[in-house]
């Protein structure tokens, strides 16, 4: 929903923005679909190939820090508050955190300028996203829960040698839908 709202606000010439659920290509129809989904969920744990899967890549959030330190202009001015806001309010979108950071510093931008600044804070967005990915994966693995991950980036993670981390070959978008279908839980951390 947040992506659709963003497109509708900043790119109004794109008609018919909508949410696209990553869980599959077909949606359940009405109450019958809901009842069917509930029936399918019962006993699903025994039928799923994976308990928990994570399609996202691993990037060390610390790798973004030099880019953030070297930021310029408005971006440098709002960097500390923006990062703090994103870390303290993970439920908020990056756009909301940016709006609040700009408001705190009394900076008023046109929509076009806002998009330029949003593009400029991407390293900060990726930093926080990677930070939360690392923390979430750590909690799962420390709990002794097996986590299925995809792609070689996980071999470089601090968890690469964990007996609970199963690293698979990278998957494309279509294959990721198949992984989700085979998973009891599939999670992601996004900005």
Predicted segment positions?
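Nucleotide-sugar donor-binding catalytic core of glycosyltransferases
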Residues: 3-33, 46-191
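Short Gly/Ser/Thr- and charged-rich N-terminal loops/segments
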Residues: 38, 42-45
């Amino acid at each position: 929903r947040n992506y659709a709202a963003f497109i509708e606000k900043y790119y109004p010439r794109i008609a018919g923005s909508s949410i696209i659920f990553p869980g599959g290509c077909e949606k359940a129809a009405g109450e019958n679909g809901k009842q069917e989904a509930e029936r399918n969920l019962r006993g699903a744990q025994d039928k799923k190939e994976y308990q928990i899967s994570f399609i996202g890549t691993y990037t060390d959030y610390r790798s973004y820090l030099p880019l953030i330190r070297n930021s310029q202009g408005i971006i440098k001015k709002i960097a500390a508050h923006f990062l703090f806001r994103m870390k303290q309010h993970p439920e908020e979108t990056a756009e909301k955190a940016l709006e609040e950071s700009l408001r705190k510093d009394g900076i008023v931008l046109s929509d076009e300028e806002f998009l330029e600044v949003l593009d400029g804070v991407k390293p900060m967005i990726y930093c926080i996203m990677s930070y939360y990915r690392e923390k979430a994966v750590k909690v799962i693995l420390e709990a002794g829960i097996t986590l299925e991950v995809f792609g070689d980036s996980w071999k470089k993670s601090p968890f690469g040698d964990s007996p609970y981390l199963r690293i698979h070959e990278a998957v494309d978008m279509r294959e990721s839908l198949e992984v989700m279908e085979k998973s009891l839980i599939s999670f992601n951390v996004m900005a």
